[in-house]
Amino acid sequence: MGGLDKVPVKGIAAVVGAVLLLILAFTTPFSSASDTQAATEEPEVTQVGDGAAIPTARTAVTTPPAEHPAVSIPAPAAGAKPTQTVVISVDGGCETDKGTIRSFLDVGKQVQGRFTFFMSGLCLLPDAQRMQYRPPGHLPGQSDIGFATAELVDARVRVFADMWNEGHEVGTHFLGHFCGSGGVAGWSTQEWRDEITQARQFLDNWAANNPQVTDQSLTLPFDSSVIKGDRTPCLEGDRPAMWAAFAAEGFRYEASDPGVLQWPRKVAQNKLWQFPLPALKLSGTNLWVLSMDYNLLVNQTNGETDVAPGECARVEQQTYQTYMDALEGVYNGNRAPLFLGSHLNSWVCDSYIKALQRFIVDAKTKYPDIMFVSNNDLADWLDGMDPATLKGLQQLPEQKY
């Protein structure tokens, strides 16, 4: 397995702690870069933080980014319900040795959908270069998730290129994934900005950090300027401090808050769209759970990731039905965007991946007029909407079902 295709035990413990706090709040509804260096030339060598010698970077990202395929969400017509949007975001978004991300992109093609991938920036920084990372409040090279397996970087770059070329969005899930005590919850505005700066550098300088990738034609069709939004580790962070950092970094939305099935609003002081994870009714129960796979995990298996095959089938079906019920609720109700979060992790026999993929295909079959869009697509639509129309939608009550 690659370094980031599983959340480590320590990470799950921190996640579960954060999830339990959140659960308590929801007991009721509510132009391509070219190679400038000939293959026969010897690359210049430089030293990095840990003393390792790596080739000086060739240009391996496209600046400005290659043109992104456009999407057009119809403007709401007078007297008609707006288009139902479904926004699926993936925390991590780094390809594994199982080809999980590529498979998910293939599902997106079936429904002409676009997703958001919140990239964990360390998935392109190999372990041999870990000392380049200077995490706020922690020792150099420290992280609560793994660094990249060097052998997987080539595949990850190719999949990231496919993501962009197929219209998907690349956001950030930051780097070290520090949750709980001593983690991101206590970071200042400047510490958040330091983390973002490093995340940008590791993306833009991926080739310099990975001399084992010998294909000189391999290039990302985008650079870090495309990052316009985020989700924080474990949904943590001091809101005023991080919002100030994100606005200063040119973000246009934030996706770390819990919420309800209601039309999004902007934070008044910094104009960031708030795209929350809503509470969904867990099928067959009276529980309302955040629409993220690990929140479902805690409620369905008490956080256990390895269960009996029969339990796997139960979890998959319950998760699938939870998503379908929520979509039916908003589609027949206030038409608020439906936000669903995932890690595309292998927990519980891949139950959450299977349920989400089934949902995407079946939802589009049942409701052909729905659109699967990215967070950035949604922000474009909302920003371009008639202000009076948008205000009216925002004043609709939360959807219950």
Where are these regions (language model features)?
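Well-ordered, non-membrane alpha-helical segments in soluble/globular domains
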Residues: 98-102, 146-157, 192-197, 316-325, ...
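Active-site beta->alpha N-cap acidic-glycine motif
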Residues: 58-169, 176-180, 202, 211-237, ...
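Active-site cleft segment of glycoside hydrolase catalytic domains centered on the general acid/base Glu
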Residues: 178-199, 203
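Active-site-adjacent pocket scaffolds in enzyme catalytic domains
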Residues: 134-137, 146-150, 216-331, 386, ...
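C-terminal domain-boundary segment and adjacent tail
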Residues: 71-73, 253-265, 324-401
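N-terminal pre-catalytic segment of deacetylase/amide-hydrolase enzymes
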Residues: 2-88, 96-103, 373-376
